[in-house]
Amino acid sequence: RLMIRVSKVFLFVFILFVFVNNQVFAQLTYVLPYPSQMPGNKFYEINQAIEKLSYFWYFGNFGKTYYYQRLSDKYLIEAKTLFEYKQYLLAYKSLLKSNQYFEKIYPYLLSAKKEGKDISEKQKIFREESLKHLEELNKLKKSTPEEFLWTPEKAKPTRLNIRSLIDTSENIRKKYL
């Protein structure tokens, strides 16, 4: 009798472990990178130059897809971090960059498909990236103001429509789901 109870408990724990483990795995399929150098850091400009030069390192449709995915992720995380520190102007610019790079990904996938390459795995990754970006953008929407008036010391103020930009960013990602 004790053996039957122990085996039932063991079976329950095993099933629970498998179920919980699968849920965690489903949430972690696409991982965004750790933020790199931020604007204002003395190495930021160097990283920008390396980033531009690395464009030539990634050739072919799959190479360019990877290159633009990497940059889109990088600038989304940069924007997220800057928004958290209330550096709204820099964050706004970073999110614009992320959008620009994100929109360059899909045409390269289409070109690869036209060349007869199997893009199913790359499309899956692109979809996971889109979903992860949407998740982060949704968090940003909840934690940022709708608008912000950026007032530099010796220049005209700039109105940043943060909510509108986040909505645009979401629409760009949803377009490819």
Label the model's feature ranges.
Residues 2-11:
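Bacterial N-terminal signal peptides that target proteins for export
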Residues 11-21:
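Bacterial N-terminal signal peptides
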Residues 23-177:
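Long, charged/polar, soluble alpha-helical segments
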